[in-house]
Amino acid sequence: MKSFFWDFFGPRAEGTAQHFLLHLREFLSKNQCPEMPTGLRSEGVGHQAVFCSPPLEYQAAIERSLRPRRSTEE
């Protein structure tokens, strides 16, 4: 499964990432995407990442629309 990540850095990284996560979930709901793993994780001091692991058929649309900073294959 592919996961997309949006990275946030600095002293306000956590708050900014939480805010982005709300907008990510709104985007998924508005576009009638199925439930998928989304969340926030700490990558270290001053580095937060929002992640989304969409089904294959939604990956291209999410990547094109939201332009994640990085992705991983699991």
Model regions: which residues?
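Positively charged, polar, low-complexity stretches
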Residues: S29-Q32, P68-E74
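Small/flexible residues
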Residues: F4, E43, L66, S71-T72
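Short, intrinsically disordered low-complexity segments
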Residues: Q32-S65
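N-terminal acidic leader/helix
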Residues: M1-K30
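Short amphipathic alpha-helices in soluble, non-transmembrane regions
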Residues: F20-L24, A60-S71
